[in-house]
Amino acid sequence: MAEQTEKPEWWDQAKKELSEADPVMAQIIRANPEGFLATRGNPFETLLRSVIGQQISVKAAANIWERFAKACKEIKPEIITRKHRRTLRTAGLSERKIEYVFDICRFFLENPDAADGFQHRSNEEVIKELCTIKGVGPWTAEMFLIFALRRPDVAPMLDYGFIKAVGQAYFPEIAFEEWSAADRKEEMSSVIAKWGPWRSLNNGPMQY
């Protein structure tokens, strides 16, 4: 898959329909007229970035990735698997994340056609297969669907940034820290129901 720097073919239709269905989204779309969901075009790299970025800040993840990429020279599974663990630890990876990185490498080495194959499979099928890899759970699989495959209908309900952004946009009167899990689930579900098949549009400019 080549890097896709042009907006998805469904993007303009999604913006139009969301603007008509949801006044809050209409305002967000007007405020961000040029943005769109981009992808690096490299599913292997996207999955690695998602795992390396788990449970740390965006800034910390970017710094670790920069050191990791420099240590590996090329982001290819056959190259990364030959690196000594000490090299990856020096780049900032924990022992657990090193295990995850190696397991992702093994998956792509054993399934060389996986990247193209994912394009023709349902969201549920992709999530199920990705979750067989160590370190890949539902959150990481959903990030992959959004940022690698650019699927339009993914609402990452486990993503802190997504939840907080929805809260700030739709429920500004509620302090995020006081938003109970039960209320959050109910209120977010009512918001997301308005988005129809375009739930990925609200995932902001971040790129994995």
Features from the language model and the residues they span:
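A short secondary-structure junction motif
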Residues: 49-64, 90-96, 202
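Intrinsically disordered, low-complexity, charged terminal extensions of DNA damage-control enzymes
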Residues: 1-43, 194
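Glycine-/proline-rich flexible loop or hinge segments
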Residues: 43-51, 84-87
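Intrinsically disordered, compositionally biased low-complexity regions
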Residues: 13, 17, 63-66, 70, ...
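A short, structure-level motif marking secondary-structure boundaries and short turns
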Residues: 11, 32-34, 50, 69-70, ...
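Short helix-loop boundary/capping segments at the starts of domains
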Residues: 34, 53, 57-61, 70-74
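Catalytic cores of DNA base-excision repair glycosylases
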Residues: 68-208
